[in-house]
């Protein structure tokens, strides 16, 4: 696998100026990406990481249908055309894999709302029929206190099999080259092992990136689970070093992670370096001096 890639992140619903709530109207907004391909090539981009593209209630991380592109972005064919054009330009396509939770509009959860414990999908979620603070008649686990994000039960083999089958269709229909696993830090680790084995059997170079904010990156970035994780530690050091006119923090982090000593913690790992993303403030907003913007990117590319 070639880890020497330059990623460009696109949050499609924002990039394409789609409505914040799903209005059910199909508009091929995702085709806007086609006009940007020459710009991506000029920048030297080799891979595009797309935020959520599948049908959702609102922001994309509340998935309703893993098989259909969100109508606010267009049709499956529209996205296939974008993926084909990127591939023709020598640019890989990586999708956001949102597997920890779904939206309340997800078909299986709606079935549970209707049939309660009689639903064949009751075990797809972590449900408590004796405790509820909702109008559903039952309580359920969500992601970090957000009830619109219903936690999937990844201990359930049927759920895992369903998700792997959806990934198979993404590979077949769009030719995707990898996945970025949303909130990988709280994903079921047996599921990630199963996922790795499944996709690597299809394509040994299929790329698995995990979102990991803190903790020991080796817990997820290893030969059993993921190829890479997000390097939040160095992201902080990049802008802090500029704001203090002192490169000690980023230098300390890099030496701690990849220095020459045997106790350096991440020697041999391939971590994703980044300056900002959709979960944090824009780099230009956190820098005290906007003239430091190109310097941060120069430093990041030299890491």
Where on the chain are the PLM-derived regions?
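Short catalytic-loop micro-motif centered on adjacent basic/acidic residues
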Residues: 94, 178-184, 283-284
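Hydrophobic faces of well-ordered beta-strands that scaffold small-molecule active sites
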Residues: 6-9, 48-50, 93-95, 179, ...
